[in-house]
Amino acid sequence: MNKYKRIFLVVMDSVGIGEAPDAEQFGDLGSDTIGHIAEHMNGLQMPNMVKLGLGNIREMKGISKVEKPLGYYTKMQEKSTGKDTMTGHWEIMGLYIDTPFQVFPEGFPKELLDELEEKTGRKIIGNKPASGTEILDELGQEQMETGSLIVYTSADSVLQIAAHEEVVPLDELYKICKIARELTLDEKYMVGRVIARPFVGEPGNFTRTPNRHDYALKPFGRTVMNELKDSDYDVIAIGKISDIYDGEGVTESLRTKSNMDGMDKLVDTLNMDFTGLSFLNLVDFDALFGHRRDPQGYGEALQEYDARLPEVFAKLQEDDLLLITADHGNDPIHPGTDHTREYVPLLAYSPSMKEGGQELPLRQTFADIGATVAENFGVKMPEYGTSFLNELKK
């Protein structure tokens, strides 16, 4: 008998809660995503997260301890060697990743691009982080005239290749991306995803076509999601969750356009009758505010998210469990534009917790979440992680 019929897991992408013990190895001493945002905002207004116990993990400006938190609270330390989205999420679902995925804020190394040019017979232009629409405005015409390939990246571990469909036929573009995928399996380049980005149109009016193709990496082992799906439980992936796991262990995928759309979809799943896991990633914190080093925007986004939580609380059933966490930090006050190696918060709440919650022991790996989900549904336990299911008292 499952303790909880439905588990709703929410990952606030990049919402770290202070430097991890190994932060110095990552160049992240002093990083503190929520703490620094709270200082910048002269106090964060997150009353619903506070009720759950956020300030009991650690007091920050505007975020105080409460006498009787509604839920259980602690923080988690990442065990894997990376601080990227895929590593964090894969660890949450029970894997340990010892090869970090690389990000390329300065563009890709010359030796990689030289090899790609040699193997494809086409010149490469671009080679920088950019938005897909902006890079087409800037380089689309040159690409058409020269037959070169526009290579660009983002704040995530991706290598994207754009070409006009009438200049580089789709079949050729897909072959080129397969070559790039092979080359970037090398540990020194380890890229999470290669994406074909075909476009059409004329200068000043380029549009990306639906013929995008992703060459992702499947998780390096079976995750708790695979075990759930194989045991006929529902695994509803909201936002970029399905992409992060390359569809592995997913029974239904709901795309989102923004954090608020993500919260809408979460409310939709709360209205659904299912047994299993609903897994939401809220990416805006990271993509729009963390990497762009925008503490004001980040703080406002956190407050907007918090304001949506009463809708979630109102729809939770007695046999539901809500888990809120993050996958890494991305301190908008920290130098650079990269993620930061931090502890992440963990809040656990169910309406069945009539006495409220208390502090859980510090979690030594994000995989404790996967272990807890696995134990709840009686599926094979992951190799890594310790369940805290029995510590959650009704």
From Swiss-Prot:
E.C. number(s) listed in UniProt: 5.4.2.7
Annotated catalysed reactions: 2-deoxy-alpha-D-ribose 1-phosphate = 2-deoxy-D-ribose 5-phosphate; alpha-D-ribose 1-phosphate = D-ribose 5-phosphate
Pathway membership, UniProt: Carbohydrate degradation; 2-deoxy-D-ribose 1-phosphate degradation; D-glyceraldehyde 3-phosphate and acetaldehyde from 2-deoxy-alpha-D-ribose 1-phosphate: step 1/2
GO BP: 2-deoxyribose 1-phosphate catabolic process; 5-phosphoribose 1-diphosphate biosynthetic process; metabolic compound salvage; nucleotide metabolic process
Pfam families: Metalloenzyme (PF01676)
Coiled-coil regions, chain positions: none
Broad EC category: isomerase
Xref: SUPFAM superfamilies: Alkaline phosphatase-like, DeoB insert domain-like
UniProt: Mn(2+) 2 binding residues: 286, 291, 339
GO molecular function, one term: phosphopentomutase activity
Domain of life, source organism: Bacteria
GO cellular component term of the entry, any: cytosol
Cofactor comment: Binds 2 manganese ions.
Location(s) in or outside the cell: Cytoplasm
UniProt entry keywords in alphabetical sequence: Cytoplasm, Isomerase, Manganese, Metal-binding
Gene3D superfamilies: Alkaline Phosphatase, subunit A, Phosphopentomutase
Residues reported to bind Mn(2+) 1: 13, 327-328
Keyword Metal-binding among UniProt keywords: yes
Obligatory cofactor(s): Mn(2+)
Family: Belongs to the phosphopentomutase family.
Role summary: Isomerase that catalyzes the conversion of deoxy-ribose 1-phosphate (dRib-1-P) and ribose 1-phosphate (Rib-1-P) to deoxy-ribose 5-phosphate (dRib-5-P) and ribose 5-phosphate (Rib-5-P), respectively.
Listed name of the protein: Phosphopentomutase
Source organism: Bacillus cereus (strain G9842)
